[in-house]
Amino acid sequence: MTRLRGRAPRGRRIAEATPQGHWQVLTTLGALAVRGIVGAMTVESATDGDVFLAYLEHVLCPQLQPGDVVVMDNLSAHKVEGVRELIIACGAELLYLPPYSPDFNPIEQCWSKIKLILRTLKARSAEALEQAVTQALAAITPENARAWFTHCGYGTHN
């Protein structure tokens, strides 16, 4: 990822070399709880229903506790057959956000911070990008998560 903005001394243009071309796809799936990122997974493909079901089954569901509430947006992969059943089997509840409502989705702010960190780190290879993603995910603190939930209007408790 490349930085979108920068600063330069007055009267001078900012310039930075940026690679151009087509790159392999690297997708990170994750869930945000008040305690921070829970269950992150990186795959070398776009997210489809099969990838998302594998993420739920092998990564997220083992971390869910009875009484947890899983809130999802309306991405088509979130609505494939089997998603609701997996989450309910964990004892959690599944809620979908209204269409076009990123203001109610705290993970949107989390991804924004992660993308800022990735742009700053300027990883240019797949291996470096995976390390940068790990570093960016580790930078998400419980304080960040709690603030994002509060900003989106969700009550949080200690």
Language-model segments: what does each one mean?
Residues M1-N158:
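Short functional hotspots at interaction and active-site rims
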